[in-house]
Swiss-Prot record:
It holds the Pfam family Cytidylate_kin. GO terms for molecular function: ATP binding; CMP kinase activity; dCMP kinase activity. ATP binds at residues 7-15. Keywords: ATP-binding, Cytoplasm, Kinase, Nucleotide-binding, Transferase. Gene3D superfamilies: P-loop containing nucleotide triphosphate hydrolases. Its main location: cytoplasm. This is Cytidylate kinase. InterPro entries: Cytidylate_kin, Cytidylate_kinase_dom, P-loop_NTPase. Belongs to the cytidylate kinase family. Type 1 subfamily. One of its GO terms (biological process) is pyrimidine nucleotide metabolic process. It comes from Chlamydia muridarum (strain MoPn / Nigg). Its EC number is 2.7.4.25. One of its GO terms (cellular component) is cytoplasm. CDD domains: CMPK (cd02020).
Length: 216
């Protein structure tokens, strides 16, 4: 079974996807982290001037795909964790992900991971583009101010004000929704949930019965 969770940044996709995967004992794939891995690698001095085709053909990054384990990202065989949450990497990932060759490359990897077993995929175009026939599609929304407050918890203290981050998120939403290639849209047949005033437990209470009915 494939479950997709789409939506803009800060809506709780990662937290929900992890909790849902744990509840169902499914694999979990954070596709945003995959794009940020590419962005991080591309920002390194040794790779900034390398032609995109060569960068993707002999990448300095890699991912581990294994059953019953979250996807792990590596740069030159070194695990990546905190490097992927910087605002610089996030902003560049939003730009870099618009490249058709980058999206095609990533979608191939994501579909390969889906072949490993049942999985919860979170991102921005999982249900609309990559897995349009997923058994369950969820689209999360939330008020921009609440999303900014959540995102600030992941950033170094003092790196951005809540007001500045709110403005960045709104601008990114517009860019994601208006891009020509695979824009951020609500997938057909998706369950839309506003997470502004809901805990992850409350969201799980809404969706787990639906998923069990699809599994029956």
């Amino acid at each position: 079974m494939i479950i997709t969770i789409d939506g803009p940044a800060g809506t709780g996709k990662s937290t929900l996807a992890k909790a849902l995967a744990k509840t169902l004992q499914f694999n979990y794939c954070n596709t945003g982290a995959m794009y940020r891995t590419l962005a991080y690698a591309r920002l390194q001095p040794d790779w900034q001037e390398v032609p995109l085709e060569d960068f993707l053909a002999s990448p300095p990054f890699s991912f581990s795909f294994s059953k019953d384990a979250p996807l792990q990202a590596f740069y030159e065989n070194r695990p990546l964790t905190s490097e992927l949450i910087s605002q610089e990497v996030a902003n560049f990932a939003s730009i870099f992900s618009k490249e058709p060759k980058v999206r095609a490359y990533m979608q191939t990897l994501q579909k390969r991971y889906a072949s490993v077993g049942s999985c919860v995929f979170e991102g921005r175009d999982m249900g609309s583009k990559v897995f349009p026939h997923a058994e369950v599609k969820i689209f999360l929304t939330a008020e921009p101010e609440i999303r900014a407050k959540r995102r600030l918890k992941d950033l170094p203290e003092g790196s951005l004000s809540q007001e500045a981050l709110t403005a960045e998120l709104i601008a990114r939403d517009q860019a994601d929704q208006q891009r020509e290639l695979d824009p951020l849209v609500i997938p057909a047949d998706a369950l839309v949930i506003d997470s502004s005033d809901l805990t992850i437990s409350q969201i799980l209470e809404k969706i787990v019965p639906l998923i069990h009915s699809r599994l029956a």
